[in-house]
From Swiss-Prot:
NCBIfam families: PRK03634.1 (NF002963), rhamnu_1P_ald (TIGR02624). It comes from Shigella boydii serotype 4 (strain Sb227). Belongs to the aldolase class II family. RhaD subfamily. Catalyzes the reversible cleavage of L-rhamnulose-1-phosphate to dihydroxyacetone phosphate (DHAP) and L-lactaldehyde. InterPro entries: Aldolase_class_II_sugar_metab, Aldolase_II/adducin_N, Aldolase_II/adducin_N_sf, Rhamnulose-1-P_Aldolase. It comes from the Bacteria. This is Rhamnulose-1-phosphate aldolase. The gene is rhaD. GO terms for biological process: pentose catabolic process; rhamnose catabolic process. Keywords: Cytoplasm, Lyase, Metal-binding, Rhamnose metabolism, Zinc.
């Protein structure tokens, strides 16, 4: 019998959550991570499935995700503990045939449940599936320190925030040419913040929750982690620059245009126009 804890997706979640903890992005039970799987991914581990999988209804139906398996982090779970006990802190779930709820197939032991941000994740998965023709499979939420700090001092506007991050590090325009969406402050763990995040995910692979954290989407765990890491590195540079009196020189609009042409990406027009 194959052990699901040795699967690529459980091992990938262990690495991503451990790396995020070591970065300081996920204190206590902060942050959540979901990865969309295929039936073929979980098929070799049918002997690991709970004898009587628990069923949990969704707060709103999501037919686009019908019959889709995911691996998710648990509610109230600490990222730092995932590596110690994957089955207690992670779960494999599968949405039912009409998208009205899901069964917990593996993990989330002792009656644990998926992250409270699951509605936001699932709504964002729906939008990224449509926006990327199914390429994006990961939604990651974390409390990236410097990105949060910038939401207190920069205008919380997509164009302004995006342009500052592009100028903070040359690679940023190449990594997220679609810019960074920004919400107003909202209560977390609600359908409302999930819907607002998903709306921004139609246009952006990164979405900031001011004074709280960031949502990122990507095709793999590495790509998604790297996306957030790149934006956070630029934010760290900007925090240092602002603390030293601000920019005396920076990357110009013309240089940003040249950068986009060189790497074959189309920069967000509103950010480029500033």
């Amino acid at each position: 019998m194959q052990n699901i804890t040795q699967s690529w997706f459980v091992q990938g979640m262990i690495k991503a959550t451990t790396d995020a903890w070591l970065k300081g992005w996920d204190e206590r039970n902060g942050g959540n991570l979901t990865l969309r799987l295929d039936d073929a991914d979980i098929a070799p581990y049918k002997d690991n499935v709970h004898a009587q999988p628990r069923y949990i209804p969704l707060s709103q139906p999501m037919p686009l995700l019908a019959n889709t398996p995911f691996i998710v982090t648990g509610s109230g779970k600490f990222f730092r503990n995932v590596q110690l006990d994957p089955a207690a802190n992670l779960g494999v779930v599968k949405v039912d045939s009409d998208g009205a709820g899901y069964h917990i197939l593996w993990g989330l032991t002792n009656e644990a449940v998926p992250t409270s941000e699951l509605p936001a994740h699932f709504l964002s998965h729906c939008e990224r599936i449509k926006a990327t023709n199914g390429k994006d499979r990961v939604i990651m939420h974390c409390h990236a320190t410097n990105l949060i700090a910038l939401t207190y001092v920069l205008e919380n506007d997509t164009a302004v925030f995006t342009r500052q991050l592009w100028e903070g590090s040359t690679e940023c325009l190449v990594v997220f040419p679609d810019g960074v969406g920004i919400l107003p402050w909202m209560v977390p763990g609600t359908d409302e913040i999930g819907q607002a995040t998903a709306q921004e995910m139609q246009k952006h692979s990164l979405v900031l929750w001011p004074f709280h954290g960031v949502f990122g989407s990507g095709s793999t765990l590495d790509e998604t982690f790297g996306l957030i890491d790149t934006a956070e590195k630029s934010a760290q540079v900007l925090v240092k620059v602002y603390s030293m009196g601000g920019m005396k020189q920076t990357i110009s609009r013309e240089e940003l245009i040249a950068l986009g042409k060189r790497f074959g990406v189309t920069p967000l027009a509103s950010a480029l126009a500033l």
